Amino acid sequence: MTSAFNWSALAFILAAIGLVIFMLVVPRLLGGRSQGTEKEEVFESGVVGAGNARIRLSAKFYLVAIFFVIFDLEALYLYAYSVSVREVGWIGYATALIFVVDLLIGLIYALSLGALNWAPADKRRKKERLSAAPAGFNLASITKFNGIDELHTDPTGKVPAQSSGQVNVSNDIEANKRHLANIDRINVTGNVTSVDFSTQSTNSLSNKSSS
């Protein structure tokens, strides 16, 4: 029985050594060889490495690790109390309560120091809220339509962006009133036509007098 176990262990060791030799020798004999600087470069998963291998970690990781060790070891003492809660009685309960309160005070102190704050100090400052004062104007009075008498013209004689159409308002207000009054005659086809009734009436009177 002992000899059979020894032979099986020896066979396993020889098989493991043979497998290692096979994996090292056969690829060297069958694989191709090439020389160059690119072959000597260090790469990880087919990607050429860049930068330094030493990464600068934030000090916050160090603080969190220290706090974890401290509170973890302190919480380990509570395990001893939990398995012997009946034996220690109320005295043990009061001792554990004081211990927990001490842990909470330490945690509050660490929070007050900002040890667990990951954001920079300037981002944690409360920004002043901008309060917009109500507008001191009446929107209805601004958007109401002004009559032709109230429109102000620019130097070219046009109303700048205050009328819906490009009405040419010159300094002769009376002529423009007469012209706008003529734009209310609609013919039988439904199209709006501009007819100067004063001119038409003058022409008709002249025709009658000539006849």
Swiss-Prot record:
It catalyses: a quinone + NADH + 5 H(+)(in) = a quinol + NAD(+) + 4 H(+)(out). It is an enzyme of class 7 (translocase). InterPro entries: NAD(P)H_OxRDtase_bac/plastid (IPR023043), NADH_UbQ/plastoQ_OxRdtase_su3 (IPR000440), NDAH_ubi_oxred_su3_sf (IPR038430). Its main location: membrane. The keyword tRNA processing does not apply. One of its GO terms (cellular component) is NADH dehydrogenase complex. This is NADH-quinone oxidoreductase subunit A. It comes from Psychrobacter sp. (strain PRwf-1).
